[in-house]
């Protein structure tokens, strides 16, 4: 059977092993070609082809609920559930998502993109099933990397104690995003490669195969008994101690073996863990060799895996400056939550291994760990995607800001990204500026980024700087770094008619918008505020009082954002300026090219210029109407006085 002939996952149950192997090869080809064109998560999906086939053979989706942790590895699932003909639109504006999305299919149950959540949701769905008297299965598919997140253990502890019937499929590829770290990774490795267990398993199998006539039957019987043997040879069975039945490890690229073990799990009455060992990037040599690089990213050459040359990214600039500062100051440390490459810290990890800490997918721990480092006299920098910092908000407030500790939050992917609602970095400005003691910065370009990082490390308190994903602007980089005055912005150009205030990279957009306005004889002041908190009150108040027409522009949510901060400042000082706020409205932003969304929200030079013109037009219209309004008010007031005097 070809993939194009597949109308639903129920057809998989009737396919022979050879047909399944052919289908697996075709699925890998489709995924490779699509991701090479559109970008996306290549290696994780290549590694789960056979596992996904087996899941849909054993379980009856959508009645049985298959939940994909993070769900970046759900491409195969999408192809098997009727989305082949839309698959070429993967991650494109108006196309299908790179993660599960219930709006797309009844086979998708959550709109996910963060790690370690699937077991909690599965336990909740299973409990709802039991309360309703239903009997469908609930399966959580989670990677070994996601098991470094504490939330997964909270759910395992709950399910094991409660004996809720739920199946947890542990996809163990020893990687997740980057090479896994920590005790759990080492524990799983011992299960996979423990010499006692593996040696006995091999020797027994070989001996049984040699028995004439009954060898195969004896081997099958031994397979059924091996769980008991495993208890004797692998000590401290973690999952068993939590109350789960443990099955595995199983070859994650053997469909028949996977089907057998999943059927066993389905037959168990209580919670079960199925340990599946896979190869990330399976079937594509360059993805197998460099699974970290091909975890997720942009387009590449399908034959070689190479990407085109280009200028430095903001992440790379950040990483280079971190190395420079660490060489000068032995107190500088770097922390990542399983994203060394994505955050630009790979070089730092090589040069300063003693001051580099990958804590796994554990953002809460990362922030409080940074607080401990700072309390001990170090200058820690936690490099984290904006969307993932949300997971550690309490720790930022309670363990860092309340203690007023010198922890730097280097917030990558601040703004719009291709991956959609689960990954948009648009909330950080609003939630960080509400925190006392916190300094919040946004650079207009990569040169300002390096000065802001130095500023944060010189500051004796918590500081955050947010910068976007992707290529930097290509401006020259200063050799000598200088700390910026805290709370001081920059006037990029003076103007008399309207003030354009662009946060971060929007400052450059405002500068170009000012040029467009100048062509229409409109004089625009352009301000790079640099600081969300503390604001440059003197500069912003001058713009409000002297210019009167103000447009704030931010690649962040409007609710509680930078524009709101400016309005609060004006209200507190009685400044009667007309303020037009531009940014992300009160909605979740879907997947697609950020440029398309910037255009939709008017966050382009043309869009900003148009809003500024419209604001000035309204102000002129209001000014022209003021004499008429005043005369109507006088007439109404005169009439009221006349009525009070008995006049008619």
From Swiss-Prot:
Cofactor: Mg(2+); thiamine diphosphate
GO BP field: 1-deoxy-D-xylulose 5-phosphate biosynthetic process; isopentenyl diphosphate biosynthetic process, methylerythritol 4-phosphate pathway; terpenoid biosynthetic process; thiamine biosynthetic process
Reaction equations catalysed: D-glyceraldehyde 3-phosphate + pyruvate + H(+) = 1-deoxy-D-xylulose 5-phosphate + CO2
GO CC, alphabetical: cytosol
Functional pathway: Metabolic intermediate biosynthesis; 1-deoxy-D-xylulose 5-phosphate biosynthesis; 1-deoxy-D-xylulose 5-phosphate from D-glyceraldehyde 3-phosphate and pyruvate: step 1/1
InterPro entries: Dxylulose-5-P_synthase (IPR005477), THDP-binding (IPR029061), Transketo_C/PFOR_II (IPR009014), Transketolase-like_Pyr-bd (IPR005475), Transketolase_C (IPR033248), Transketolase_CS (IPR049557)
Amino-acid positions noted as binding thiamine diphosphate in the UniProt annotation, renumbered to this chain: 72, 113-115, 145-146, 173, 363
SUPFAM superfamilies recorded: Thiamin diphosphate-binding fold (THDP-binding), TK C-terminal domain-like
Documented EC number(s): 2.2.1.7
One Gene Ontology MF term: magnesium ion binding
Residues noted as binding Mg(2+) in the record, renumbered to the chain: 144, 173
Function: Catalyzes the acyloin condensation reaction between C atoms 2 and 3 of pyruvate and glyceraldehyde 3-phosphate to yield 1-deoxy-D-xylulose-5-phosphate (DXP).
HAMAP family given in the database record: DXP_synth
Name of the featured protein: 1-deoxy-D-xylulose-5-phosphate synthase
Species this chain originates from: Symbiobacterium thermophilum (strain DSM 24528 / JCM 14929 / IAM 14863 / T)
Designated gene of the protein: dxs
């Amino acid at each position: 059977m070809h993939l194009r002939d597949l109308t639903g996952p129920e057809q998989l149950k009737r396919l022979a092993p050879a047909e399944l192997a052919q289908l697996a090869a075709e699925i890998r080809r489709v995924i490779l070609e699509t991701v090479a064109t559109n970008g996306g998560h290549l290696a994780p999906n290549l590694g789960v082809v056979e596992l996904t086939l087996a899941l849909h053979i054993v379980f009856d989706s959508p009645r049985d609920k298959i939940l994909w942790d993070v769900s970046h590895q759900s491409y195969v699932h999408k192809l098997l559930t009727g989305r082949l003909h839309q698959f070429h639109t993967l991650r494109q504006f108006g196309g299908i998502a790179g993660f599960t999305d219930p709006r797309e299919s009844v086979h998708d149950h959550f709109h996910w993109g963060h790690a370690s959540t699937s077991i909690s949701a599965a336990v909740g769905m299973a409990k709802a099933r039991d309360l309703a008297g239903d009997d469908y299965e609930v399966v959580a598919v989670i990677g070994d990397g996601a098991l470094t997140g504490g939330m997964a253990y909270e759910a395992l502890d709950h399910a094991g104690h409660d004996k809720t019937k739920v199946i947890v499929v542990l996809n163990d590829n020893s990687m997740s995003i980057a090479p896994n770290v920590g005790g759990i990774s080492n524990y799983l490795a011992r299960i996979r490669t423990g010499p006692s267990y593996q040696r006995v398993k091999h020797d027994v199998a070989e001996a049984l195969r040699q028995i004439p006539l009954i060898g195969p039957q004896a081997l099958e019987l031994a397979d059924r008994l091996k769980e008991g043997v495993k208890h004797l040879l692998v000590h401290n069975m973690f999952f068993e101690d939590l109350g789960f039945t443990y099955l595995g490890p199983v070859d994650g690229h053997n469909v028949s073996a996977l089907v057998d073990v999943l059927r066993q799990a389905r037959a168990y009455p209580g919670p079960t863990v199925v340990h599946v060992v896979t190869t990330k990037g399976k079937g594509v040599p360059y993805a197998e060799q460099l699974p970290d690089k091909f975890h997720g990213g942009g387009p590449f050459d399908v034959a070689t895996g190479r990407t085109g040359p280009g200028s430095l990214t903001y992440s790379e600039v950040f990483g280079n400056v971190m190395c420079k500062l660490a060489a000068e100051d032995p107190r500088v440390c770097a922390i990542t939550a399983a994203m060394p490459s994505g955050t630009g810290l790979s070089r730092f990890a090589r040069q300063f291994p003693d001051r580099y800490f990958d804590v796994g997918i554990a953002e809460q721990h990362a922030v409080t760990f940074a607080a401990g480092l700072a309390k001990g006299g170090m200058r820690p920098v936690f490099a984290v995607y904006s969307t993932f910092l949300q997971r550690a908000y309490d720790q930022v407030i309670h363990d860092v800001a309340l203690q007023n500790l010198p922890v730097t939050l280097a917030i990558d992917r601040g703004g719009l990204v291709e991956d959609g609602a689960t990954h948009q970095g648009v909330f950080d400005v609003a939630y960080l500026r509400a925190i006392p003691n916190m300094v919040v910065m946004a650079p207009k370009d990569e040169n300002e980024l390096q000065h802001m990082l130095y500023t944060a490390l010189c500051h004796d308190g918590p500081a955050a700087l947010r910068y976007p994903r992707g290529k930097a602007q290509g401006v020259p980089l200063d050799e000598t770094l200088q700390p910026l005055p805290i709370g001081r912005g920059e006037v990029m150009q003076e103007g008399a008619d309207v003030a354009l205030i662009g946060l971060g990279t929007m400052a450059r957009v405002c500068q170009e918008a000012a040029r467009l306005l100048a062509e229409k004889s409109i004089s625009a002041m352009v301000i790079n505020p640099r600081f969300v908190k503390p604001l440059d009150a003197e500069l912003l108040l001058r713009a409000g009082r002297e210019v009167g027409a103000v447009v704030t522009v931010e690649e962040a949510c409007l609710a509680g954002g930078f524009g709101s901060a400016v309005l609060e400042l004006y209200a507190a000082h009685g400044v009667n300026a007309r303020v037009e706020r531009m940014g992300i409205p009160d909605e979740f932003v879907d997947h697609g090219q950020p440029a398309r969304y910037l255009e939709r929200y008017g966050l382009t030079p043309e869009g900003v210029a148009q809003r500024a013109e419209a604001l000035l037009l309204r102000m002129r219209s209001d000014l022209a109407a003021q004499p008429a309004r005043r005369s109507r008010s006088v007439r109404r007031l005169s009439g009221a006085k006349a009525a009070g005097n008995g006049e008619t």
